[in-house]
């Protein structure tokens, strides 16, 4: 016996019902869909609830997608401690170091954690608390 000769046990697998293959097959002509009507013709569309007001129309409309939304790559102060003292930090430096994956609309520095290094930071945005922490550590931060 070889692998290609293996067969499942009798009755272990159901035979697929082939419909619409002539009247003598028992499932010809209307193919088990009965006579006329919506379900006899084609599929009922997605979300159809038999004429009842569908769920997506019963719920109120909410919000919108702002096409001008800017999303910034966030960097916290404790992420910046990996750099050497006096390093100039830009978006490209952060991407190369693996701190952020991509720049998105720019990089924003937030004040989560502590900064122990004197760094020169040039980013798109920063919080006031982050600015205070960077300057307290002896560094500088500016918007480019």
UniProtKB/Swiss-Prot annotation:
Region listing for Disordered, in residue ranges: 1-43
Origin superkingdom: Bacteria
Keywords annotated in UniProt: Ribonucleoprotein, Ribosomal protein, RNA-binding, rRNA-binding
GO CC field: cytosolic large ribosomal subunit
Transmembrane segments: none
Bias (Gly residues): 23-35
InterPro entries, A to Z: Ribosomal_uL15, Ribosomal_uL15/eL18, Ribosomal_uL15/eL18_sf, Ribosomal_uL15_bac-type
Statement: the UniProt record of this protein carries the keyword rRNA-binding: yes
Ranges of compositional bias, category Basic and acidic residues: 1-14
Cysteine pairings via disulfide bonds: none
One of the GO BP terms on file: translation
Gene Ontology MF: a single term: structural constituent of ribosome
Record's subunit section: Part of the 50S ribosomal subunit.
PANTHER family named in the record: 50S RIBOSOMAL PROTEIN L15 (PTHR12934), LARGE RIBOSOMAL SUBUNIT PROTEIN UL15M (PTHR12934:SF11)
Function statement: Binds to the 23S rRNA.
Membership in a protein family: Belongs to the universal ribosomal protein uL15 family.
Protein name, entry field: Large ribosomal subunit protein uL15
